[in-house]
Amino acid sequence: MAQQYQPGQRWISDSEAELGLGTILAQDGRLLTVLYPATGDTRQYSLRNAPLTRVRFSPGDQITHFEGWKLTVREVEDIDGLMVYHGLDGQNQPRTLPETQLSNFIQFRLASDRLFAGQIDPLSWFSLRYNTLQHTSKQMQSALWGLGGCRAQPIAHQLHIAREVADRSAPRVLLADEVGLGKTIEAGLVIHRQLLSGRASRVLILVPENLQHQWLVEMRRRFNLQVALFDAERFIESDASNPFEDAQLALVALEWLVDDEKAQDALFAAGWDLMVVDEAHHLVWHEDQVSAEYGLVEQLAQVIPGVLLLTATPEQLGQDSHFARLRLLDPNRFHDLAAFRAESEHYRPVAEAVQELLDEGRLSPKAHATILGFLGAEGEALLAAVSDGDTQASARLIRELLDRHGTGRVLFRNTRAAIQGFPERQLHPYPLATPEQYRNLPAGEHAELYPEVAFQAQGEVADDERWWRFDPRVDWLIDTLKMLKRTKVLVICAHAETAMDLEDALRVRSGIPASVFHEGMSILERDRAAAYFADEEFGAQVLICSEIGSEGRNFQFAHHLVMFDLPAHPDLLEQRIGRLDRIGQKHTIQLHIPYLQDSPQERLFQWYHEGLNAFLNTCPTGNALQHQFGPRLLPLLEGGDHKAWDTLVADARSERERLEAELHTGRDRLLELNSGGAGEGQALVEAILEQDDQFALPIYMETLFDAFGIDSEDHSENALILKPSEKMLDASFPLGDDEGVTITYDRGQALSREDMQFLTWEHPMVQGGMDLVLSGSMGNTAVALIKNKALKPGTVLLELLFVSEVVAPRSLQLGRYLPPAALRCLLDANGNDLASRVAFETLNDQLESVPRASANKFVQAQRDVLAKRISGGEEKILPAHNERVAEAQRRLTAEADEELARLVALQAVNPSVRDSEIDALRKRREDGLAMLEKAALRLEAIRVLVAG
């Protein structure tokens, strides 16, 4: 018979028990809407298979009114599908409690209900449930939660920034690291940690259109975040009243958004917790006028609590542009450009004094006076200790100065000069004769820098006349690859057509195995191409990438880069080199540059090498120089006056050297120290590497796969193939692919093989599998035979697992203070608790399975005795529960009070600490304590043990 639903009825979710009691709001066609008042969540379910259990209490049960008073049920009445409970309250007075007024925090003894209903699970499932509780508890309390699961080498400055920013309530910061230091990874880590902690649940990412794919790949590959990419086509085709409301993470191109007012209205109406804006330095602002893009981001920043701006370094931008970014974050704090300039000058002598302390290990009288003037009387004792050579005092002094830094809490900027671990670069130019076929091509951009594209565009040619038959760069490439033999080589060219033609050329003319990679391929096809290139034993020697196709991909296991042509902008040149030139690259980068002599290619090579020095070093001034000299550069690229060309290159070189000298003298070491984490990030790196070396996850996942009927077989070293078996328990297990997937637990393997899933405690497959165990009833009952000579045959032991459970919004992060670790009780016939004397694993090794029919028969025969013991077990464990809750309250209070005191003290000396941040922390503390006060003891699982 179909289930009858009525508004006001109380139900509990089988898959999300932590939501508390649900109330039926409406039944509309085939959809059922349920409100969970405890957390404020609303869910919609299909009527046919809603994962809900009706809440019904029986005479003898004790229930709670939402105002807190309790009722012992005597009689249950059904009035038009709604339950009305009659009974006695705490003063033994008769009262009535309609189910609509039940407390939203009531817990259920589902384990005992299942045991007595004969629903007894396999013995291994009980162990799986226990271990899942323990692992969940450990991860919830881990300082690495949200940081260790990224598919990247753990890098100190990135981890420091991610933890510092993500642990704030509604962070509003500027990430302005130099190129190659991983701003996108930093932003991804912040997003990931904020989502896992519940501090954010809806994230908007605004990027330039040409970076959409790069962000999509990075978020999916590195963080397993399923981002919805929005453009005009998707927005128009959506049937939803507001397409943005369906996406937890939305990736939107700013160019489209500015031109579409309807999309803007929908975006504002959707509501977001965190906004990330990439390339924020392209948002144009002047005191008397702002661009449409800047205005739109400014409006969004006024209504979205958290804002992350990713931008070029302040030195590249200039002070006015830098002020414009800070103004987006906190318009009250940064409201006056002149005042900002004056404040910046005020901090410069302090930064120089810190530089002196770091370089010399002591302070000159001038530096001493500067810092004393900045800190005031409270700095005297600290400065005296520094003068006496106290290194700890030096560290404390730097921390005091960091806290007072004008933009230290809102701006993070790391430089290559401050970060170790980058490889050297070596340049190998190869001038080649220009073939006759290229000398009379029609004028245009392609003819100048990419003659092969212009040649192909003239029309169809015979196979033996294709451009790669006569272009000397192709002969050179084949010879170079043969010389390098099995060495991995990355080839990048500007256009997809060139990449595909080069693959043909290598196959036809040399037989060298090559993989191709361009924007016309799907993400899956690119994954396969990258995996074929990465395979050391059977893979391709060379990967040929187009400019756009290679965005967002890093191949740092290779160190030879061939630029078959040169890009038109120095930023793109740096992006190409950045595919290999990353922190963690173990070899010197070998840059191979073939170019055609007496052509625009030769002059562009000279411009980049002699003018910008962009091959051997990163070029933070490249964009400014290209903009400044562009009007002279473009006409001269085509040829003409050699003297004018030499003058241009010399002028660019002089201007570059001047700008670089300015950058060096303007380095703010105080800000670099704060951004780098002053050692804190390195501790996180070591903790993550230590966690990587542990075997707890592979051991646990093997038991999880076994329980759910997932077959695993060896793929290669450190890799497994997972496939659903015929006995797969639950089709909703998050395998990721019905056909099967390849996984690895090894970070190094995952970095070189992007076609493999990198399993960590944070991976959706791991988290989803654990949720399936704990959100349902799997393993919450078991009956076993215990083989122990010390026990008389027939002796019955009862093992009970309890959990201290608090129903609260995830954003409060109460799991950190009251995690779902099992409170274990092992009762003998006399009611004695033996758990402290017999460890779980010790007991587990002595157990044997019992056929379900026999187990059920025994349970039914002992029902009254077992029910009494279960009740007694709850009484025994209650003091431990109360102490655990009290300890959680103490920890939350101590942690929140310490952070509050720090922020209040900080605000007195640094106006970048917002009132809203302090108020939010106070509210979180009060809400958290109130929710912990309602924490209940829940019976999680029962195991009946019979001595044999």
Curated annotation (Swiss-Prot):
Annotated motif DEAH box, positions? 278-281
One GO MF term:
DNA binding
Which GO BP annotation is one of this protein's? regulation of DNA-templated transcription
Q: Return the broad EC class.
A: hydrolase
Keywords attached to this Swiss-Prot or TrEMBL record, sorted alphabetically, are: Activator, ATP-binding, DNA-binding, Helicase, Hydrolase, Nucleotide-binding, Transcription, Transcription regulation
Q: What is this protein called?
A: RNA polymerase-associated protein RapA
Does this UniProt record's set of keywords contain Repeat? no
Q: List, for all copies, the residue spans of the domain called Helicase ATP-binding.
A: 164-332
